[in-house]
Regions:
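Long, contiguous all-alpha helical interaction modules
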Residues: 1-95, 257-494
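Basic, glycine-/proline-tolerant helical and adjacent loop/strand elements
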Residues: 53-54, 59-238
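Domain-exit/linker segments immediately C-terminal to small folded modules
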Residues: 155-334
Length: 494
């Protein structure tokens, strides 16, 4: 509303705004202005691969395309005029603030494929694009000013998941003023693109899987209105394919962590963590996509990340994790409040070797995770020596290093300046670590304990007595944790 020009028809202004709420003043002309801004759109040309049944194209175009085999083919496209939402509020807050911005395009694509995926729901935008009036402002004015107490039936466009009647025969209804406010929530919703993982040719691959919507539950209204625009302008403009790289997420919950990180960074220099914790109480999350003519809701939940969780997520970004499966598992553990290494034993046991130890990205991420764990160990742990994670890593590294020296006479200091010897060293190191990884993967319970004690600990280790006792106790009392850490430590050592 603050964006509307002052010297124009009608009344549409904010009378009061604070952290507890807002009061606005509207008349019928001001309502029309507000809705015209809300649903502003223009008719623009768009290429389509198939002709429409009941509408001739403006023209046809042929474009040369090169397929995967390098063969050049000509593909015909059909040009039509289509309505495109302007989203002026989002344009003002987008990095670069222009129509070509990928963040705004992402929001428009989401709107047209999900919230307005059914053509009939696009009528407010189509009317503005064609310069006509569909009467929605008058309808809203009538409902808001009616002296009769009543409710308004909600559609799925107003409220995600709403329907005429649910399975129990209950309709979705709300007070007129609440229905009026529901017109605006899409414009503060942050949109991201979840990535699904699939195993193809024994390698983990990623593909886009719809849209993740993040709807903030605002705790301090005025502060949020002041800080959100600044945070949105600071989003990265780096591109991955045809989407902003920062919009791609491995979990739907990561969308909320990203939004929280933006706001946290914005507030960190002036207000601190306490201000962020009060600014947003939580996030409503939805995972949507369009399948054929139907819009599917894959999940809907509420997520309330703590300040420490947002900070830990920020730490996960530097250095970046390379492997999509490793990254997703780390995020699942963060969101679930589990140790960072939880679940990797199951992954190693159920997926092909090529998707775990055999993937360079997986080994890189294991190294990075152990290094980060070392940096984050508490002062108490530092006073008593390394924690369990670092003890297991030390065992794995010592075992591989000793085997290299005993079997091949190789040490790092003797090969680091000779490219050929260095390559041979790396090859043999990976082979020794791989054999141990596969041996651990195939053993559980007592069999793993016997292998760990009889093979990995068969070479001299420089462990202090209390460290040896701690490791021995964990081997018997936390066998699965030690096994998981051993798999990761061998991956990190290769």
């Amino acid at each position: 509303m603050a964006r509307l020009p002052e010297k124009t028809r009608g009344i549409a202004r904010i009378l009061h705004l604070d952290d507890a709420g807002a009061r606005v003043e509207l008349d019928i002309e001001g309502m029309r202005r507000l809705f015209d801004e809300l649903y502003a759109a223009s008719m623009e040309e768009q290429k389509e691969s198939q002709p429409r049944k009941d509408e001739p194209p403006l023209r046809e175009e042929e474009v040369e395309q090169t397929d995967a085999k390098g063969k050049v083919k000509r593909k015909k496209y059909f040009i039509y005029k289509v309505p495109v939402p302007r989203a002026g509020l989002l344009l003002d807050h987008a990095p670069g603030a222009n129509d070509a911005g990928l963040w705004v395009k992402l929001w428009r694509d989401m709107l047209w494929r999900t919230l307005r995926g059914v053509p009939a729901t696009r009528l407010p935008f189509i009317a503005r694009a064609q310069g006509t009036d569909n009467g929605d402002a008058e309808k809203a004015w009538k409902r808001l000013t009616s002296k009769k107490a009543g409710t308004v039936q909600l559609s799925s466009t107003d409220y995600l998941g709403a329907m005429d009647r649910n399975a129990d025969g209950v309709s979705f209804e709300d007070a007129p003023r609440e229905w009026f406010l529901l017109h605006f929530w899409p414009y503060v919703t942050q949109v991201h693109v979840p990535r699904a993982l699939k195993l193809k040719d024994k390698v983990i691959q990623e593909e886009h899987a719809g849209f993740a919507l993040v709807i903030p539950d605002v705790g301090l209204l005025q502060s949020f209105c002041e800080e959100l625009p600044h945070a949105l302008r600071e989003r990265s403009t780096e591109v991955s394919g045809f989407r902003p790289r920062a919009a791609l997420v491995d979990l739907v919950e990561e969308s909320a962590l990203m939004t929280g990180r933006l706001l946290r960074e914005r507030l960190s220099q002036t207000e601190g963590a306490r201000a962020y914790s009060a600014l947003v109480l939580g996030y409503e999350l939805a995972h949507l996509d369009k399948e054929g003519n139907n819009v599917r809701t894959y999940s809907a939940s509420r997520f309330e990340p703590t300040v420490s969780m947002v900070d830990e997520y920020q730490a996960l970004q530097h250095p970046a994790l390379w492997d999509p499966l490793f990254r997703r598992t780390r995020l699942q553990n963060l969101v679930g409040g589990r140790p960072w290494y939880a679940g990797f034993d199951r992954i190693a046991s159920t997926l092909p070797y090529t998707a775990t130890f055999g993937a360079k990205g997986f080994r890189h991420d294991a190294r990075v995770s152990f290094e980060r764990n070392k940096d984050m160990e508490s002062n108490e742990s530092a006073a008593t020596g390394p924690g369990l994670e670092q003890l297991v890593l030390q065992v794995a590294r010592t075992y591989v290093g000793r085997k290299l020296k005993l079997k091949h006479g190789m040490e790092w200091d003797g090969v680091k300046d000779d490219p050929k010897k260095k390559a041979d060293y790396e090859k043999e190191k990976e082979r020794i670590a791989r054999d141990a990884f596969l041996a651990v993967r195939s053993r559980t319970g007592p069999d793993f304990i016997a292998y760990f004690a009889g093979t990995l600990c068969s070479v001299p280790h420089h462990l202090k007595a209390e460290q040896f006792v701690r490791l021995s106790r964990a081997l018997h009392e936390r066998t699965e944790d030690v096994r998981t850490l051993t798999l990761l430590a061998l991956s990190a050592t290769a």
